[in-house]
């Protein structure tokens, strides 16, 4: 709830338990007045005509939209002609809109006297702080997706692959030197396209816990957008709608999130891990837990956005402004001495250099530019991304419409350059020489009157708090990633040196305990790096024999050529993201237990698996095979919700008739 007086919040607590509001404002009389205005507009008599409204699509006499046709055209022309003068006209026009966002009610205070522009942080350095957020190949056309990657790589910035995986053909630079691969690879609840190879082709891995445009929902790709290419990359079937689960089925607590972060840092020993959160009340507490789970970057995503995988109702009615989530996360992290362990990033409607400055003052070090990047490539905001009928080839898989795509990497480079150039000029005007000088300086923001009672009643002070100790935080985006302890694989990698160097077939044996987590994952990273995913290794080229109880995530993302053989049992997440390896789990020879009657592997087995084999002499726990899209498995039973959201693979689960209760005749 945003912008209500205390009395309304107290009443809401009675009727809507758990509802929170950080921003106070309108009272009961204001609500009554608004209701009367809406009623009067709807009941104009027999001859009255209802207004068009313009809620979804911009109308001249309807609701104000930030992205008006003339404004978009001006920005596109600026990017096409590389004209900063036109960009400044666009920025001025955008800022002349009536107040739409919370930041529109704020003004920037100077640090001191203006400084010469040449003394300010360079455009090149500022550009590296920008990111194009996760927009999948599927939501976007292949041309648009590739263009964003190439553009951001040219300037040392980052693009995000989104949820749908990435074409392996893009993992290598093109003949002209352009790099079409995203530096950030996303891991979402559907785990589409997530393989050991994919996870090793990046500088950063992003766990999408939620999306600002549709918090609480998984990605949704209509069947008409699932082409042969999309189906191949996502390990699914052409023409079949793909819906990701609302939650990650391996994240039901902050400890589970810590385990996934650990898994990702094992499969890619070089990358940082980002956790994408949605702006919401209480996000600060979540951010503190994420920081303690050894994440490196936290993204606070605002409610704007959505590119064809978000229902229109969610885009309009769900989520909160990034200003609220970002300030809360920054404040809580600073209060708990966690802020200098994390890089904060935000996105969700950053349209001008002024927005970037305000986001920095609220605590952001990096900035996501999504919708504006699409507009620079030609998007005209017809708002039919989900229908596969984008007339300019940005958000469609229709080949005829894709041929109309006129975007280029140069246009996106110009866009990010203009953002950086405007930021640089504003920094000089307020007496700052770098963005680092103003990050977290919410005291440099002040609320201003907009001459409207319903706006001036809003109390934005919760956004403007500068907590004790915030002035001692050192903002270092280049710090090494937060380290995680080694697993048994550190020993395996040393012992398997001949296999990794010369491809020698080997068999290694170890005693395993439940404290040995993610066994087989680090060695899989080495296999993918050395031999590739489509290698000529035999399925048991490197066999690891384990005796005992294996910890969580046994064989996570196990690569082709690796066989893990356990005599004992294993905890949760066995074969998570299995990518071609083989896992065999059987009871110890001395075990008196009947295999078919007892659980031998834990919950959420084969979650997001894309290839490989699992054989378990015993039962699996809950959520077995959820989102399996290619692995073949044999188990002797499983708990509830088994094999849900599967798009491929085979699961054989023999059941003894002695376990069934057959109906009797009446």
Each model region followed by its residue ranges:
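Conserved small/polar residues in nucleotide/adenosyl-binding loops
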Residues: 1-10, 658-666
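Active-site capping/gating regions of soluble enzymes
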Residues: 4-41, 311-457
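Conserved, well-structured core domains of diverse proteins
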Residues: 4-232, 409-428, 432-542, 550-554, ...
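Short acidic, glycine/serine/threonine-rich loops at helix termini
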Residues: 4-9, 164, 171-175, 217-222, ...
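Glycine- and acidic
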Residues: 127-138, 239-248, 266-273, 307-316, ...
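Short hydrophobic alpha-helical runs that function as membrane-insertion/retention elements
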Residues: 159-162, 297-300, 366-369, 565, ...
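Alpha/beta enzyme core
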Residues: 199, 204, 212-345, 354-366, ...
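Long, distal/terminal scaffolding or interaction modules
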Residues: 473-660, 666
